Amino acid sequence: MKTVQEICRDLGITRKTLFYYDRIGILKPTVRTGKQKAKEYDEEAVKKLEKIIRYQAAGLKLEEIRSVLSEPEAERGILTEVIRRQNDLISMIQRSLDQARCLLEESSEGDGNNE
């Protein structure tokens, strides 16, 4: 079992984030112990949290992550959509870079003609 402090330290997240996941029901503590009802998480919960963090890093929204976690058969479709969105973003960035490169080349050519 891991405490909130251990999980936050090991996975680089804040207590606020972990408590938020509990509040919205995406990741509940395995047990609550002692008078303070301290939250503790077993290895399965830690693995689930690692998935949540990876999915967020990949651009999934929490509702999408909830669907993936509750309906594993939905994972492929959701991840395919995320890949499509990321590819669209890459294409947009590439077009912007190409436009900037053209503007720089035009600017350089214009500077050369004035000499």
Regions found by a protein language model. Give the residues of each.
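Short, charged amphipathic alpha-helical surface segments
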Residues: I53, I65-E115
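Basic helix-turn-helix/winged-helix DNA-binding cores
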Residues: M1-E63
